[in-house]
Amino acid sequence: MERLLVLKLDAVDCEAEASLNGVPLARVDAARPSCIVPIHEYAIAGPNELGLVIWPRPAITPASPPLPAEARVADGKRMAQLRILLPRIGSVAEESTARTLAQLDWAPPDGDSYEAPLALSQSFGLPVNFPRWRWLEAPVIEDTPTLRAQALKVVKELATDLAAGQPARFLAATRLRTEEIALAYQRRPEDETERLRERLLALHAEGRLTWRPVTPEALFLRSMAEGRLLECLGADGGPVLTTEPDGQGRSVALPLRVTAVEGRLYVLR
């Protein structure tokens, strides 16, 4: 692979969230004003939908009742830039050194009124063909008490096994995701699986897999990809499978974006 398709999001004095094909991939704010993420596993053949939300709701905002929009006035300084870039492997992902395939900009002049959250979108094509990912064929699912209980059980089992230095259940649960990520980045699935296994075992050996408590109150399911995926989040809006900080303040987070088919959960992203 000579080039890497990435999403680059920058913001000044505001919060912003970027999505691709309905899946939120990057969020920035004053503390973290820039973010770059590879996006092969979320790109599709044909038209792709790029989304940018200014002042997004918290990730765990309840779907109902809907919160009212907030009236705001631009100060001429706040801005956000979203780019899809195609840099060469090893090169810096900057507009000056990479091909720009799509972009969204928000920079209202001083005094302009707007309502937040403010959503912008753009459709664009890609010069690369991607497979038809499984999540595109997943059924639309709803966050129900039964599904929430099932997700809680799965996450608790994964956390227990990983904390004991036993990654087999996690590797099996994420097999479909691992296979597609390997395909997306032209790697071998078995190599990707082994890399993940070694990483998890190394973290356990370092004593870094003490997970935050996984409780019903700490699990939230965020709908995305037009309802085809549910992301398992904790009370802070990050992945529910997140460790307690170690002595250096480092945490490990393992995102889980799942679907449900015939009563069984599958981790697809």
Where do the PLM segments sit?
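Accessory beta-strand-rich segments of carbohydrate-active enzymes
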Residues: 3-61
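Beta-strand-rich recognition domains
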Residues: 1-16, 53-269
